[in-house]
Amino acid sequence: MTLVATATLPTRYGTFTSYAFRVAGGDAEHLALVMGDVAEQPSVLTRLHSECLTGDVFGSYRCDCGEQLDLSLRYIAAEGRGVLLYLRGHEGRGIGLSNKIRAYALQEQGRDTVEANLDLGLPDDAREYDSAAAILRILKVTSVRLMSNNPKKFDTLARHGIPVCERVALAVPVREENERYIRTKQLKFGHYYFDENE
């Protein structure tokens, strides 16, 4: 993992320092948005966010990605300190944009999000988070409060010796358009979600 560029990034959430990283031996680039002092600090509020063009940019209701991104940046801004890693190459759980749209078409025919990927001969989830752990190491983040519903992220950070002190829930609205998607992730991937009545 190589740090290739850094610059100030003013946003509607506040001002971040942006760090662009390139994965060794590949074309993948990831972006870290950092607010405040995170080096050698305990329990840094952190989000590992998988790229999702349809959700993050266009506000698609098929998933909860865009709302999780927005909420994560709001939490970091409110605290005045934190890290958001925007992980490129994770589109459609790592299958790419075109294949994600093909999977959407299968979902419209009744397949769930996992079945659709498998029907296309693709993995149910091709993402890796080792790159995220490497970036956190470069940023000298020693422990995190992780904003995530995905247990795979917790496991990867633990394997790399980055303690997760707390899981910060990202409770975004379940909509008619994404309810089946969210329930499938909960049932098939063990994602953490709240019942709205809890």
Curated annotation (Swiss-Prot):
Record keyword Nucleotidyltransferase present: no
Enzymatic class: hydrolase
Species for this entry: Burkholderia mallei (strain ATCC 23344)
Cofactor note: Binds 1 zinc ion per subunit.
Family: Belongs to the GTP cyclohydrolase II family.
Function per UniProt: Catalyzes the conversion of GTP to 2,5-diamino-6-ribosylamino-4(3H)-pyrimidinone 5'-phosphate (DARP), formate and pyrophosphate.
Alphabetical UniProt keywords: GTP-binding, Hydrolase, Metal-binding, Nucleotide-binding, Riboflavin biosynthesis, Zinc
NCBIfam families: PRK00393.1, ribA
Name this protein carries in UniProt: GTP cyclohydrolase-2
Positions bound to GTP: 47-51, 68, 91-93, 113, 148, 153
GO molecular function terms noted in the UniProt entry: 3,4-dihydroxy-2-butanone-4-phosphate synthase activity; GTP binding; GTP cyclohydrolase II activity; zinc ion binding
Pfam family, one: GTP_cyclohydro2
Binding site for Zn(2+): 52, 63, 65
GO BP terms: riboflavin biosynthetic process
The keyword Nucleotidyltransferase belongs to this UniProt entry's keyword annotation: no
Pathway where it operates: Cofactor biosynthesis; riboflavin biosynthesis; 5-amino-6-(D-ribitylamino)uracil from GTP: step 1/4
Catalytic machinery residues: 125 (proton acceptor), 127 (nucleophile)
